[in-house]
Amino acid sequence: MIQRLVGSEMCIRDRIVAIPLGLMSAIYLAEYAPKKIRDFSKPVIEILAGIPTVVYGFFAALVVAPKIVVLGKTLGLDVSSESALAAGVVMGVMIIPFVSSLSDDVITAVPQSLRDGSFALGATKSETIIKVILPSALPGIIGSFLLAISRAIGETMIVVMAASLQANLTINPLEPATTITTQIVTALTGDTEFDNPKTLVAFALGLTLFFVTLFLNYFALKLSLIHISEPTRR
């Protein structure tokens, strides 16, 4: 069980890289992009968010993992052909459109009167974004982050194809690892009786995953409701 949790934590840690990239792209689309670029980019981002994860899994196994091995050898590091780093990087790429689209919707929903008031006081556009828009949209942005992370926690195919199924107790992202979801798949593959220990372990792992994602989704929903109610109080 500990190995599964450690593997899940390593993959989540790598996915955090996607959060600033998604947020920066959302800020650009909401505040800087011309209307033509926004009208083109927004549907493309939403299409990217709908790509099947098995495609990302193939990309991780056939492109990213070998590149990481080559880079590791160049730096004198011992990198496995299947590593938590490869899976985490690709899952980070996978959730960038998700974070970007949700954060863009939240930033766009900030009342225009706040922007106008900031400009009237002499603030620049960048100062308005940092000191007015982002603080106002912060609950919704954090909610989008949590929803994206809970989406990534339940990912299976990328981890199976890029990080292996080996239950390895390590904090080294360059080694093989496994997550809760991949172990559920492994335990329930083939003919197993309901009272088989492997089946019971799979149910325990599934219950753990359910409560973790339930907590993240609930917290994200509460933050989103705070964001929605704040403009009405203003």
What are these model-derived regions, one by one?
Residues 21-60, 101-102, 234:
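Cytoplasmic-entry segments and transmembrane alpha-helices of multi-pass inner-membrane transporters
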